[in-house]
Amino acid sequence: MRLYELSFDEVERFFYKLAELRDTVKDSGLMSYVPELVSLTGQVQGTTRVKHAFPIFQKGGVVMDVTSVEQAGIAEEAGAVSVMVLDKLPYDVRKAGGVARMADPKIIEEVMNSITIPVMAKVRIGHYYEAKVLEALGVDMIDESEVLTPADEEHHINKWEFKIPFVNGARNLGEGLRRISEGASMIRTKGEPGTGNVSEAVKHIKIVNQELRALLSMAEEDRVKKSRELQVPYELVELTVKYARLPVVNFAAGGIATPADAALMMWLGTDGIFVGSGIFKSEDPLERAKAIVLATAGWEDPEIVLEAQKMISEHKAMMGIDIKTLKPEELMQVRGA
């Protein structure tokens, strides 16, 4: 199987044409044509090109963790491109301890029925059947997430077997490429979830960028050796060199709590932002959500980020956690390397 059939631009053009066709049918009022459109999307659902096109539509946006219909409504009002449904926010997962599993399907379904933006949900690393349940439920994307307690300490889900796109976390180039080789359509550069501390996310995107620069400077024979070292197909390494970046959409996640945090991660080269506890563990969730969306979209202009930062109060931010105070066994980022 070829991992990739199209370039980013080609995938984007394909998906936009599909969206334009959908809008034309809707605007025409000729509802008899809608079944034909549904049939068309059904034929292409699950192909490599479509699974990689969905994350492209999220680029430049913010995905927000939610645990209820009310929070999902706030996220949509604030301008989130998608929501991620889970049972507890990462901060609460950390405090509660025990085993963290996927959210109640009834809650996920309620969220899906209450908003118009895409809905994602988390599964435990390696838990094939939690993923199958979410695929049957009809969510838009699955996050095989280190925030939940891993079901398999050694292996991730073989994502090629699913029609639905997956996102996975990574702390370095090797982890990212291994997840892509398993079928991930999107990568999250890992931070330390539930801390409100962006330092680990910063560290890991810098590692990815540094390792990418090293890969680009290698001779071909050295890249062959590197692919063996990273345990990924050589073709995937060559595709990474061709694009001079991870060959899928790469968002930042973990510890992002302010508009400036989001702008920093965009400046460092990510395509968008996941926000976990930073919004709904604050005392000003709607204002903070709007501010982070604004800063993510306008990160190239410091005046816009300043405007976003003025929309919130530091006194209302979530109480952060100094990562240096966490024990090694308390770190979530190390799960699923």
Curated annotation (Swiss-Prot):
Transmembrane residue ranges: none
Species in which this protein is naturally found: Metallosphaera sedula (strain ATCC 51363 / DSM 5348 / JCM 9185 / NBRC 15509 / TH2)
Any one GO MF annotation of this record: pyridoxal 5'-phosphate synthase (glutamine hydrolysing) activity
Any one GO BP annotation for this protein: pyridoxal phosphate biosynthetic process
Catalytic activity: aldehydo-D-ribose 5-phosphate + D-glyceraldehyde 3-phosphate + L-glutamine = pyridoxal 5'-phosphate + L-glutamate + phosphate + 3 H2O + H(+)
EC id: 4.3.3.6
Family of this protein: Belongs to the PdxS/SNZ family.
Binding site for D-ribose 5-phosphate: D65, G194, G255, G276, S277
Keywords assigned by UniProt, alphabetized: Lyase, Pyridoxal phosphate, Schiff base
Name by which UniProt lists this protein: Pyridoxal 5'-phosphate synthase subunit PdxS
HAMAP family in the record: PdxS
Residue numbers annotated as active site: K122 (schiff-base intermediate with d-ribose 5-phosphate)
